[in-house]
Amino acid sequence: MKDINLMSSLVKFGDEHAKVLRGINVYTEINAPRYWWQEMDTYRVGTERLSSESTMHMQGNGLIGDELIAFKENFAEGNMQKRIQMFSYQTLRRIYIQRKNHRLPQWRTFCEWIKTLPYADKLITVGTNDVDA
């Protein structure tokens, strides 16, 4: 517990003091609308996409040429896409701070999930001025 408390105090001083969070990684499967994934692409450091569903092979299976192009051009942004993603705790902290009160409900749901991770209260949400964090 002594190490966790030390890490927690360093996290409060900012990213430059919390380098240890870069080494704590979480792997998860997320099923979200494509418009949400476009916003998630903002976070490129401390995250890695391990796999994702291909619209061409999943929903557009069997289409070729102009039919395939027309399908992809008209593909709704609300369609769900599943991806397996890796995040560092440092990136999850950044996401949490920036998106916990976002107007898209998917971000609030994602931030609620972040709070369920081991030691999230000491390493991710600590010092974020959340009453219930």
Where are these regions (language model features)?
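Family-specific signature for flavin-dependent thymidylate synthase
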Residues: M1-A133
